[in-house]
């Protein structure tokens, strides 16, 4: 598209030949501030002196060679935006990002544009570059221990699950602090090493097969069912997926490896067309709806207009940075968007004089939303960036408290408080409602819910099969079994040994009927579709419990207009109900047969006004 990224190298001095500037394709210029080991050492001494502390050991030089190869000691210290064509007089007064380094030249800290430290790293005293701890701002520190070969043997999470890793020649055993164990069996060497078998904490086993170059060929689940994948020999792109029941999906690509066609297991096809530049120009959905994309700039991959299946056109304009500036709908009504220098949307101006304004703090977090009438909603955050409070325009305050891992432990709305408790795995184990009643939860070793005791003291239990599907539920003695076909679609449900509901599907996998018993009578809803997979009919039937004789039926048919929108509903023995629409499908009125029922008048935002 003609976009160019230019790198500027220092012509002379201690940074000679190093990249110290970048100009992106939109014309913005970024200055890369570099430092040497000597500069960092001097800065550390000055900082210690100004703080009245004893300077720590910070050598002026480093070895020319380390375990990782040649090292000239030069590091990136900060990135500044120094030229912005859209905001030439409003450049940031601080760097976009800043980095801190250890005396050995290891990355120690990352600071965002507000000068808030967002990441920190700690390294082994003996082994250069071996990270032994890291943390995100406001979160606990995660620590690591290593064996003599430099492999992680422990991951220590003070407020969550910790893990140990045991390495053997062809398998790795992972055990968490709840004593759950997984074993990963591997084959191959170097970059071709792959996990071919996984023993899960419940004893189940899943397996994977790969071709000679390490691409996935097949996966076998815990029930022994295999899904096959067929990658293209040259590109490696998946061309076919065959599920355990023998159904297949196919994928086709052009010479740019872009998807041009995808056929699902039901035989319906998605098609895409591209121009010479690789831009999407047309997409045909499985139901036949066509969306077209138009471009007015040969140097942009962003569309200037889209035409939907109804023929309605929506146009867009974009900034040089790819930010959406305007959207004009099918009726010619325009919505405009404003952005700040960081690319965040600051205002949306809609028809009817409606605008919404957004404000952000120095970290880029949304702190206020105000409408045209001056009604303002404000937002507050903690150091980790979790949303802690929403203050409505009337001054009412809804708050949320979090644990150290960022999980909500208490929410307050309208003066009422709800609290949550978690186990070490981060699973909710106790929920306390606004009136002080409790619901408790229990899980199996694969984190699946197996028991729930509600506010009323009633206990429900759940059982799953090897692949995780619910197969049995118990509700205070009421036992329900769930049954599935080879494609994992539910086929029937039994309650106390009696069939309660049944689901039927056709050869394409579409639902064709749901039935249940009501006072001994079989009540069924049958579904019919056209070749595009759209619902065309629903027929309800009631059969005699002994003779299966048809006692009652009622059918409703559905029709679509030439643009693919549902526009008619035709009940038995009644005139058709028709929806009248305009544009992309906005409802303008309804009629029963030839008799108008209702008309809608809409404003420039397509809202009902009459």
Predicted regions and their residues:
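Extended charged/polar low-complexity repeat regions
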Residues: 1-610
């Amino acid at each position: 598209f003609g976009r160019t990224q230019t790198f500027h190298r220092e012509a002379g001095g201690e940074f000679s030949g190093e990249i110290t500037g970048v100009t992106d394709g939109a014309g913005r210029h970024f200055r890369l501030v570099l430092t040497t080991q000597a500069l960092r050492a001097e800065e550390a001494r000055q900082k210690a002196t100004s703080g009245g502390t004893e300077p720590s050991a910070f050598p002026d030089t480093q070895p020319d060679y380390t375990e990782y190869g040649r090292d000239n000691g030069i590091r990136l210290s900060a990135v500044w935006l120094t030229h912005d064509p859209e905001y030439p007089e409003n450049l940031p007064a601080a760097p976009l990002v800043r980095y801190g380094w250890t005396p050995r030249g290891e990355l120690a800290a990352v600071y965002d544009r507000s000068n808030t430290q967002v990441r920190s790293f700690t390294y082994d005293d003996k082994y250069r570059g071996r990270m032994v701890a890291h943390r995100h701002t406001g979160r606990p520190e995660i620590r690591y221990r290593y064996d003599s070969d430099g492999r992680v043997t422990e991951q220590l999470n003070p407020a969550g699950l910790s893990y140990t890793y045991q390495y053997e020649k062809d398998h790795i055993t992972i055990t968490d602090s709840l004593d759950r164990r997984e074993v990963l069996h591997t084959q191959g060497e170097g970059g071709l090493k792959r996990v071919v078998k996984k023993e899960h904490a419940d004893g189940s086993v899943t397996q994977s097969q790969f071709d000679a170059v390490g691409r996935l060929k097949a996966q076998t689940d815990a029930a022994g069912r295999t899904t096959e994948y067929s990658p293209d020999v040259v590109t490696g792109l998946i061309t076919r997926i065959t599920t355990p029941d023998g159904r297949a999906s196919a994928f086709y690509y052009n010479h740019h490896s872009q998807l041009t066609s995808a056929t699902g297991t039901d035989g319906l096809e998605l098609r895409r067309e591209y121009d010479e530049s690789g831009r999407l120009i047309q997409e045909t959905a499985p139901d036949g709806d066509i969306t077209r994309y138009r471009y007015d700039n040969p140097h942009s991959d962003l569309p200037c207009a889209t035409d939907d299946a109804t023929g309605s056109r929506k146009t867009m304009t974009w900034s040089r940075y790819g930010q959406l500036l305007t959207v004009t709908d099918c009726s010619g009504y325009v919505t405009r968007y404003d952005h700040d220098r960081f690319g965040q949307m600051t205002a949306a101006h809609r028809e009817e004089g409606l605008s919404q304004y957004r404000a952000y703090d120095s970290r880029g977090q949304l702190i206020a939303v105000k409408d045209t009438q001056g009604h303002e909603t404000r937002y507050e955050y903690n150091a980790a960036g979790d949303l802690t409070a929403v203050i409505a325009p009337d001054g009412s305050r809804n708050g949320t408290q979090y644990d150290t891992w960022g999980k909500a432990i208490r929410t307050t709305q309208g003066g009422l408080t709800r609290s949550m408790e978690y186990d070490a795995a981060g699973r909710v184990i106790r929920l306390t409602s606004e009136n002080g009643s409790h619901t408790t939860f229990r899980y199996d070793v694969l984190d699946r819910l197996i028991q729930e005791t509600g506010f009323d003291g009633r206990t429900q239990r759940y059982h799953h099969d090897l692949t995780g599907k619910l197969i049995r539920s118990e509700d205070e003695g009421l036992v329900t079994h769930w049954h599935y076909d080879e494609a994992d679609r539910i086929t029937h449900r039994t309650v106390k040994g009696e069939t309660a509901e049944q689901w039927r599907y056709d050869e394409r996998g579409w639902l064709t009927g749901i039935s249940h018993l009501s006072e001994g009578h079989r009540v069924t809803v049958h579904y019919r579709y056209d070749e595009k997979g759209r619902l065309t009919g629903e027929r309800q039937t009631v059969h005699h419990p002994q003779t299966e004789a048809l006692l009652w039926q009622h059918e409703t048919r559905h029709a679509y207009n030439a643009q693919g929108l549902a526009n008619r509903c035709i009940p038995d023995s009644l005139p058709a109900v028709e929806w009248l629409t305009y544009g992309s499908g906005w409802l303008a009125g309804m009629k029963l047969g030839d008799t108008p029922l209702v008309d809608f008048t809409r404003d420039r935002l397509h809202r009902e006004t009459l």
